């Protein structure tokens, strides 16, 4: 069964329409680390709340392509190109 109940709000549309501006902004410093650094050879672990933020969406650049990770109302994660 496919869950198409995506989080859609004005903030989401702002992010999509201004994605280039968002990606080209200079990074800002934050006193809180996004995640604990990996210990030894363990992979990095990041909570979905930290990754998606208040808008419930994150843009991921992978090999020059932009992907969108978002959370559905049912709490599932959807990754689209």
Curated annotation (Swiss-Prot):
Source taxon at top rank: Bacteria
Keyword Transferase: no
Region annotation Disordered: where it falls in the sequence: 26-46
Alphabetized UniProt keyword annotations: Ion transport, Iron, Iron transport, Transport
Cross-referenced Pfam families: hemP
Gene Ontology BP, a term: iron ion transport
Known function: This protein is involved in the uptake of hemin.
Similarity comment text for this entry: To E.coli YdiE.
Protein name as catalogued: Hemin uptake protein HemP
Organism, as annotated: Yersinia enterocolitica
Taxonomic lineage: Bacteria, Pseudomonadati, Pseudomonadota, Gammaproteobacteria, Enterobacterales
